[in-house]
Amino acid sequence: MPSTGTICSLLLLSVLLMADLAMAGSSFLSPEHQKVQQRKESKKPAAKLKPRALEGWLGPEDSGEVEGTEDKLEIRFNAPCDVGIKLSGAQSDQHGQPLGKFLQDILWEEVTEAPADK
């Protein structure tokens, strides 16, 4: 028959192992895990994605224009993904109507398709 010291040691070891396994399993859903994950994501720099052919004409930061020198049009929406478009006054006159029709076609399709899915 094992001694009481051996039984207590085995019992303590099994409790410690169960606690370690429980902590490892619960850390996935714990709030502390989410905080660590948010800290890791915040270290990544925000990237500005622009096609190479269009660089320099989308915003005043690229061409060195002073803010407020021209009328500007800015369109921004976020329906499955974030979309933002900035146009100067001349660009708005030139591309505004086709861009408006394009956005209307896209948004109108989603409005007409949404009730059909329900």
Curated annotation (Swiss-Prot):
- Disordered, as annotated region: 29-50
O-hexanoyl serine lipid sites: S27
Q: Which InterPro entries match?
A: Motilin_assoc, Motilin_ghrelin, Preproghrelin
| Chain positions with Leucine amide modification | L99
**Which Pfam families does the record match to this protein?**
Motilin_assoc (PF04643), Motilin_ghrelin (PF04644)
Q: What kind of modification does the protein receive after translation?
A: O-octanoylated by GOAT/MBOAT4. O-octanoylation is essential for ghrelin activity.
Q: Where is the lipid attached (O-octanoyl serine)?
A: S27
Q: Print the organism lineage.
A: Eukaryota, Metazoa, Chordata, Craniata, Vertebrata
Q: Which PANTHER family match?
A: APPETITE-REGULATING HORMONE, GHRELIN PRECURSOR
Q: Does the keyword Signal apply?
A: yes
Keyword annotations from UniProtKB, A to Z: Amidation, Hormone, Lipoprotein, Secreted, Signal
Instruction: Decide whether keyword Lipoprotein is in the record.
Output: yes
Under the GO molecular function aspect, what terms does this record hold? ghrelin receptor binding; growth hormone-releasing hormone activity; hormone activity; protein tyrosine kinase activator activity
Q: Name one GO cellular component term.
A: extracellular space
Please give the biological process terms from Gene Ontology that the record holds: actin polymerization or depolymerization; decidualization; dendrite development; gastric acid secretion; negative regulation of apoptotic process; negative regulation of endothelial cell proliferation; negative regulation of inflammatory response; negative regulation of insulin secretion
Main location (coarse class) = secreted
Which positions are lipidated as O-decanoyl serine? S27
Provide the family line.
Belongs to the motilin family.
Here the segments flagged for biased composition (Basic and acidic residues) are 32-44
Q: Where in the cell is it found?
A: Secreted
| Signal peptide as annotated in the record | 1-24
Q: Which gene encodes it?
A: GHRL
> Which residues are processed away as propeptide to yield the mature protein?
53-76, 100-118
The identity of this protein, by name, is Appetite-regulating hormone
